[in-house]
C-alpha cells in the first residue's frame, strides 16, 4: 500500500485490477482501509480493458471490443493483482493497450501459485523486458500452515 500511496501523492491517474471479482473485493477493502482513492474504481482486468468474455467448452476466453484499444488512455499506472492468473491472451492485450499511452503496468503475484487454466506456466513471470522484485518475508500469513509450507 505504501507504493500506491506514493503513486497517489504524485497525482498520477491510477487504478488496481484483478482477474476475479473476489480479488477485486479484497483490493477495495484494503484501499479503503489505507485511505487510498484510485482514479478509476477497482474492477476486474476484463472490465477495465472492456473485453467480452466468451465460453469455449469449459474455458472462458476474452475478446477485444471497439473500446479495448483506448481503455488505458487516461491511466498512468495500473496495478494488476493475482498476476499468476493472467493468461497469455490477457497479458498480450494488456501490454498492447498500455503501450501507446505509456501506461505503466505493475504485475503483483506469486509464481508458486497455479498457472492460468490451459497453460503450463504463468506468462507474466516470463516477461523478459520487465523489472522484477521479490518479497522474501511472509507478512500476512502466520502459524502452522506457514511453517509447513516453508519446510
Regions found by a protein language model. Name each.
Residues 1-151:
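Conserved ATP-binding/catalytic motifs of P-loop helicase motor domains
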Amino acid at each position: 500500500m505504501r507504493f500506491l500511496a506514493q503513486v497517489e501523492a504524485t497525482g498520477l491517474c491510477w487504478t488496481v485490477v484483478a482477474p476475479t471479482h473476489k480479488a477485486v473485493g479484497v483490493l477495495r477493502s484494503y484501499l479503503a482501509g489505507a485511505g487510498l482513492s484510485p482514479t478509476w474504481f477497482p474492477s476486474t482486468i476484463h472490465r477495465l480493458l472492456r473485453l467480452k468474455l466468451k465460453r469455449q467448452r469449459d474455458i472462458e476466453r476474452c475478446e477485444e471490443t471497439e473500446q479495448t484499444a483506448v481503455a488505458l488512455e487516461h491511466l498512468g499506472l495500473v496495478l494488476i493483482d493475482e498476476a499468476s492468473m493472467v493468461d497469455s491472451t490477457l497479458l498480450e492485450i494488456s501490454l498492447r493497450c498500455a503501450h501507446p499511452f505509456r501506461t505503466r503496468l505493475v504485475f503483483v503475484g506469486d509464481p508458486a501459485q497455479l498457472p492460468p487454466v490451459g497453460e503450463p506456466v504463468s506468462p507474466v513471470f516470463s516477461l523478459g523486458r520487465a523489472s522484477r522484485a521479490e518479497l522474501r518475508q511472509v507478512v500476512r500469513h502466520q502459524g502452522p500452515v506457514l511453517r509447513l509450507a516453508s519446510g
